[in-house]
Regions:
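N-terminal leader segment of winged-helix/HTH proteins
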Residues: 1-34
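Pre-recognition alpha-helix immediately N-terminal to the DNA-recognition helix
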Residues: 40-45
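Short capping segments at the starts of secondary-structure elements
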Residues: 48-54
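Non-DNA-binding regulatory cores of transcription-related proteins
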Residues: 85-163
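A short acidic, leucine-rich amphipathic alpha-helix
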Residues: 57-63, 76
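Basic amphipathic alpha-helical segments that dock to polyanions
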Residues: 76-86
Length: 163
């Protein structure tokens, strides 16, 4: 199996949200995409969250910052859809929440996540062999994978020590 690296510090958190948004803006420019103000705002909130964040919480924060009429739910959902489709954020399906992608300049990729059921942290694992093994196993069974979501629930190291 390939080398596994966890992207976490100590949890899935981008410490320089403005720098992260700027990196995504550069990636958008390189790809001919447009990072609108609302997309940048939603991306910044996801990056600052320090934990997986739900769409409703994002909507609430956008409204707090810009006024109650500033953002309707479809606006935030469209921003999330854009950020997801272009690989700038990940959706944790099992908890219906979002986290920033630690590789905004790379092409879309599937990564496994470790999700702590106690503190709700999410750790992005970098191990291409895990994804490749799943893909190969599926194809070996005649299955044509379209997308992969691998989420492992348990306790992070900090919570496991705190029993």
């Amino acid at each position: 199996m390939g080398k596994t690296h966890a992207c976490t510090d100590p949890h899935h958190h981008v410490h320089d949200a403005a720098g992260f948004v700027a990196a995504v803006e550069r990636a958008c420019n390189e790809r001919g995409l447009r990072l609108t103000a609302i997309r940048a705002r939603v991306l910044g909130l996801v990056a600052q969250a320090g934990r997986p964040i739900k769409a409703y919480d994002l909507l609430e924060q956008v409204r707090e910052g810009e006024g109650a009429g500033a953002a309707a739910p479809p606006t935030v959902y469209r921003a999330l859809d854009f950020l997801l489709a272009n690989g700038f954020i990940h959706k944790l399906e099992s908890i219906n929440a979002f986290v920033a992608c630690h590789h905004p300049n790379s092409a879309q990729h599937s990564v496994p996540f470790l999700i702590c059921d106690r503190c709700h942290s999410a750790t992005e694992l970098e191990d291409a062999s895990i994804v490749a093994t799943l893909d190969a196993a599926a194809r070996g069974l005649g299955f044509a994978p379209q997308a992969q979501t691998l989420e492992v629930h348990g306790r992070c190291a900090r919570c496991a020590r705190a029993r």
